[in-house]
């Protein structure tokens, strides 16, 4: 455990270093820390011995080690902090017309990436928690059709498929009827379970040959089990990490799994400093924050960047963007649920 003065010194070194990326000497600390230069140097030496500070090769100053940044995050960083100077810029960036949910999530991801210079990832509500609230089949031709699904009464998902060779028109009607009777109003996780248990038994009552029918069910509904992921600033990862991080960001489903695992049960926000279970994220920092998607649940807003990032500003931007995005989504869903009328 370090003393209060040593904690203040570490915090100040972290603050100064993340602003300038230059080693910090005792004279720079004396302007804020009410102690002699010798006392400050002695405390810096103790912090270095504890592995929280590192010597610079080109100067007598010190800089935070990865362990030092982690200590700062765990003991001094407020995860709910907001810098009012950033509020105006975020609100201004969100001043655009959105025609669908994906527009807003993609825009928010770009805003966070552009304002930090790092990589941002936004996830929609976890698939397992969404509900199937609408289903229809539109026959496009003699040989293909379109399954139109609605999640949470607002999110459309479409899957085009080739009609099985042995299907007649009545078979498509039966397919739709089974979905409406057994799967409609179920959560996605329940649909996954029913496709393995109930549906095979039900299908036998409607179809003589069931193999291609069960394959059709799997094909149509597999889309529901995928995370909706929006990545921005992927190329920025090359400035603070190696190629493995850049390549990992291409695997959006695995990215989503890793980010969800970074939050413990019941947590609304977390900061991992070189502490991810995923090897491609093991040498970076990951900020993760839940934001409200009204009427549906929580999305996930994440920032991936270097260990020596400005944590206070990064946390502030994540918080502000999360709040502004939630407000924008609230307006969007209220509009969808209201009576539409034209204003002249």
From Swiss-Prot:
Keyword tags: Repressor, Stress response, Transcription, Transcription regulation
Top-level taxon of the source organism: Bacteria
Keyword ATP-binding part of the UniProt annotation: no
One GO process term, biological-process aspect: negative regulation of DNA-templated transcription
GO terms assigned for molecular function: DNA binding
Pfam families: HrcA, HrcA_DNA-bdg
HAMAP family: HrcA
Function: Negative regulator of class I heat shock genes (grpE-dnaK-dnaJ and groELS operons). Prevents heat-shock induction of these operons.
Family assignment from sequence similarity: Belongs to the HrcA family.
Protein name as catalogued: Heat-inducible transcription repressor hrcA
Species this protein is from: Streptococcus pyogenes serotype M3 (strain ATCC BAA-595 / MGAS315)
Lineage of the organism: Bacteria, Bacillati, Bacillota, Bacilli, Lactobacillales
């Amino acid at each position: 455990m370090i003393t209060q003065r040593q904690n203040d010194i570490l915090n100040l070194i972290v603050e100064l270093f993340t602003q300038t990326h230059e080693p910090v000497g005792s004279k720079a600390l004396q302007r804020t820390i009410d102690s002699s230069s010798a006392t400050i140097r002695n405390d810096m030496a103790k912090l270095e011995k504890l592995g929280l500070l590192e010597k610079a090769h080109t100067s007598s100053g010190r800089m935070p080690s990865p362990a030092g940044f982690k200590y700062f995050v765990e003991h001094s960083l407020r995860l709910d902090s907001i810098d009012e100077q950033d509020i105006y810029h975020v609100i201004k960036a969100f001043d655009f017309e959105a025609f669908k949910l994906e527009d807003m999530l993609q825009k928010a991801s770009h805003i966070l990436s552009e304002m930090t210079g790092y990589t941002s990832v936004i996830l929609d509500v976890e698939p397992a928690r969404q509900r199937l609230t609408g289903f229809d089949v539109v026959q496009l031709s003699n040989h293909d059709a379109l399954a139109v699904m609605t999640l949470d009464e607002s999110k459309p998902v479409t899957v085009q498929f080739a009609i099985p060779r042995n299907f007649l028109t009545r078979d498509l009607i039966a397919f739709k009827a089974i979905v409406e009777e057994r799967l409609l109003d179920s959560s996605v996780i329940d649909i996954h379970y029913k496709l393995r248990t109930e549906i095979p038994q039900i299908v036998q009552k409607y179809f003589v040959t069931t193999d291609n029918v069960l394959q059709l069910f799997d094909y149509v509904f597999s889309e529901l089990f995928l995370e909706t992921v929006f990545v921005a600033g992927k190329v920025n990862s090359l400035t603070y990490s190696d190629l493995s991080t850049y390549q990992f960001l291409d695997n959006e489903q695995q990215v989503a799994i890793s980010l969800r695992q970074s939050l413990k049960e019941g947590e609304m926000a977390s900061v991992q400093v070189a502490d991810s279970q995923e090897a491609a994220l093991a040498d970076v920092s990951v900020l993760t924050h839940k934001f409200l998607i009204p009427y549906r649940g929580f999305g996930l807003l994440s920032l991936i960047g270097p260990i020596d990032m400005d944590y206070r500003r990064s946390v502030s931007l994540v918080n502000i963007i999360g709040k502004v995005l939630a407000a924008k989504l609230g307006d969007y869903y209220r509009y969808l649920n209201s009576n539409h009328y034209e204003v002249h």
